[in-house]
């Protein structure tokens, strides 16, 4: 992702990029059907569904004067509303903390995008999908962690361990809760 610290007086005020590493720890009871809390690959898939919006994206604070200029350039290039080559994108989202515009690879945030800010956004996006106990995010030489109280009662499939949808059906294997 690329970003900058708008209003900051230092190197980070300039537009620059990072590769981030995100670690999500979940906590719950062991699902007797599969003898695990949650399949690791499903944690990754669940997280990636929303977090892929940050991959190769520009992240700007909502009051950054670069934002209208970037959108103007994207409009002139014909890529503001998407492009056939823009295939790595998630579903658009809008929360109190951030809004994703996947068609133009842009995430607009309320706060400056720091590692601490990313943790807040990730937790907000995933708190209803996973029982998150801890999130750690590192980007460049910066790293932060935050622990959370797990409180969700998430119905999970006894056959494959992933969360059932609102109708009590497993989206992976089709199991139906009785």
Regions found by a protein language model. Name each.
Residues 164-165, 177:
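Cys/His-rich microdomains that often coordinate metals
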Residues 126, 162-164:
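Alpha-helix C-terminal capping segments
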Residues 154, 167:
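Residues immediately within or flanking Cys/His clusters that coordinate Zn2+
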Residues 15, 166, 172:
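Short glycine/serine/threonine-biased micro-segments
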Residues 158, 171:
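Cys/His/Pro-rich metal-binding microdomains
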Residues 161, 174:
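Cys/His-coordinated zinc-binding microdomains
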Residues 1-152:
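Charge-rich, low-complexity N-terminal segments
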